[in-house]
């Protein structure tokens, strides 16, 4: 961590970079470097199918230290890997597409965007039609009971 901190400090001082972020760092790994230099971002695996950062204190740590979380693979395995978890989510999500008059992917992005940590989804598609729809994920607020119903479907149990 000290070698990384020294290298980043040098790059910041030289004006070669303006901000520094990490990827997939745990709170303890982040803290080792954060004690030496400011960390602006942590890119983590986060989606409705991969929401452990909500229960392992990763997101709480980032909120405390004002580190902006970026979610890579924000749609998770929802469209890729049928499982008991995705079936539970689909059962809750499909009626919400009617309620909110939107597509499943937009609801999945909206769910992430409503987290109080201010998570920034990293979009991995190059499909222009899908990219064109993405701004609609910011045009409505999912009701809290729907947000929690999706989280519970993902967890397979009542959430804390």
Predicted regions located by residue number:
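Beta/alpha (TIM)-barrel catalytic core signal, keyed to glycine-rich beta->alpha loops juxtaposed to Asp/Glu
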Residues: 1-160
